[in-house]
Amino acid sequence: MEYSPKYYSNLKKRYPNVAQSFDKFASECAKAGPLDKKTQKLIKLGTAVGIGSEGDVQNLAIQALAGSASSDEIRHAVLLSATTVGFPRMIVALQWVEEVIAAQKN
């Protein structure tokens, strides 16, 4: 399952140089420290839960699954957000993740 948030896809079409610069920035941030890719994706997933971004939560869940994260690790990352972002935001994010996991199984 491939997923690209609609707004980012639109940005890439309209402003390809801006999108390319952002992608380069994101890549440099990822290389700047000792965290492995799976840990990076799970941290970013928690951040996406915090801002309540469905597209980012689903995109990062897809990326984490495509890497080495298990479905249970992804669920755990979302569950951990509850004490910081609140139960309602966590539970809706968990549903977004479950949709991705279900789609991956099909």
Map each language-model feature to its residues:
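Acidic, glycine/proline-rich low-complexity segments that act as flexible tails and inter-domain linkers
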Residues: 1-40, 62-65, 91-106
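Mid-chain, well-packed structural core segment of small domains
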Residues: 52-80
